[in-house]
Amino acid sequence: MSSLSIAIGMVVDDAIVVLENVTTHIERGSDPKQAAVHGTNEVAISVIASTLTMIAVFFPLTMVSGMSGVMFKQLGWMMCAIMFISTVSALSLTPMLCAQLLKLQKKQSKAFTMFYRPIEKSLDGLDNWYARMLNWSVRHRSVIVIGCIVFFVASLFCAKGIGTEFFPAQDNARIAVKLELPIGTRKELAQEISEKLTNYWLEHYKGIMKVCNYTVGQADSDNTFASMQDNGSHIISFNISLVDPGDRDITLEQVCDEMREELKKYPEFSKAQVILGGSNTGMSAQASADFEIYGYDMATTDSVAARLKRQLLDVKGVSEVNISRSDYQPEYQVDFDREKLALHGLNLSTAATYLRNRINGAVASKYREDGDEYDIKVRYAPEYRTSLESLENILVYNAKGEAVRIKDLGTVVERFAPPTIERKDRERIVTVSAVISGAPLGDVVNAGNAIIDKMEMPSEVTIQVAGSYEDQQDSFRDLGTLAVLIVILVFIVMAAQFESLTYPFIIMFSLPFAFSGVLMALFFTNSTLSVMSLLGAIMLIGIVVKNGIVLIDYITLCRERGQSVLHSVVTAGKSRLRPVLMTTATTVLGMIPMAVGGGQGSEMWSPMAIAVIGGLTVSTILTLVLIPTLYCIFAGTGIKHQRKVMKRKRELDVYFEAHKDEIIKK
């Protein structure tokens, strides 16, 4: 569906060029059938070349890897198919319909005249103004070139005010909240707090919040999925659903920020995490700057993580900072004495197995019903396995059937230990994640790196930036390489069409101004440079050169008909102005709903549409002036070179005629 939305404005470009040229021939008095044939033949090569340049842009997208590849592979295939079909239709169906439906009407109705005559006068006035302006431009070439260079350099200053991010966060109307009370908090108290918060949120966000569910308690040992999550009697997890974005006046990010501020009023929460989108992963997740701290000694890395967290909270745009390593939890550990085990005829494995079965349970039998089979687990009742004294009195039987208490085999002690030990590349790691709200990811990462540079770091500890920023840099690198490849492919296509390296070189001068337009559009709309806006910039490579191809192709046609360089440039510019403006207008108008549209998913595609609108608008305006001017410069240089060659040839002919006898004698 996104491919169709993007292609709506582009799919009619080829038909517009063909239809406009056929209409021009009919207005000059040609028969509609002859006009359809001759008009289509005149622009067929440029239409095909324009389509090939678009395919050269979108086909490489099918080979991108990583997260960007997942996003853009289908887009690339769909756009290639759509552009191919639109070109075939423009070169076959459009001329046929023109021959059958178009005719020069000498008398028009009054209503048509009243409506169309002002538009026609305006367009004719625009054509004449552009012809005069183009006539002045080609006679003041240095002014035009210098002015365009100054404009390009000035637009680069907009880059300083543009932040970077991976993907824009999407409003999917979901929020997850994870709260931690002090370890050891009773489940009844956690449920009471959960119920209180649920009622408050449903009342405070009435008309905005649809559902608010919560879970409290420790997962059972046979609940594999739940046991992999952080859980316990002191941990509360909320799953919240809001109404659709179009049905509320507040954004999902604003709701999350308000909830974070409200949770700060509860001192009983040791940790409070509000997760936009309901998950920390995926393209709907809120942007976060992740700093990975590597080090073997856990006390040292915990200290570094705590210091980094305190300083990151002071960074502008950071609404929440989380440390991946959970608080140390109390647990009972049994230190077995091997001598006592041997004395009672037991080994370490047997004693540990007995202890585990009595606490976690052992499968004693099976229960079968309706063809299904269920395990029956047997274990001690909670009052006999939850305190230090009860653990010490658990009985273990040796081979003789003698019962021995755990306290007679070792010592039961209470210790604090981390729930999990994270590792990456076989090294211990703790991650500090700064949740970003209202600031670009790149700015927060730069601020974090500045903090790290000033911190006194133990020699055995290292910190690396990871997460979304690492994915962003990889995607930017891949898309940059892709852009270079696309530029080369587009140049090859144009060189094959014009059978010249000069004309493609002239057309390529429109690309820098497309990127100027992208920077200006992102700057003035307060948007960030993300993977999506880069995709829009890459799309412009194919869209922008289409206008240049149409101009240069018609200038070449006028030159072949015997017109001078200046006359060819002005004639072609005046003739191709309307199709260039129409194709640009259809693409821009097709992108406007995507740029300003609401609903879920609009946040992702909006930067791409903004980039295309800004880049195409600026490049079209400058292309209509700069490309003809550059053509005159290169054509004038070529003519001067030809004159020098012809002059030398004449001089050689004169010299040969004057010294012919001497040369023959020698």
Please annotate each region the language model reported.
Residues 1-24, 31, 63, 81, ...:
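Hydrophobic transmembrane alpha-helices and their membrane-interface caps
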Residues 8-22, 43-63, 70-116, 238, ...:
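Transmembrane alpha-helices and their membrane-interface boundaries in multi-pass membrane transporters
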Residues 19, 302, 309-486, 490-498, ...:
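Extracytoplasmic/periplasmic membrane-proximal domains and adjacent transmembrane bundles
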Residues 36-48, 68-80, 126-141, 163, ...:
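Alpha-helical membrane-interface segments at transmembrane helix boundaries
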Residues 43, 114-167, 257, 291, ...:
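Signature of alpha-helical transmembrane segments and their immediate interfacial
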Residues 62-71, 143, 149-185, 225, ...:
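Transmembrane helices with small-residue packing motifs
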Residues 97-109, 166-174, 229-239, 270-288, ...:
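Flexible hinge/switch segments at interdomain interfaces of large molecular machines
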Residues 189-284, 339-361:
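Solvent-exposed, membrane-proximal periplasmic/extracellular interface segments of envelope transport
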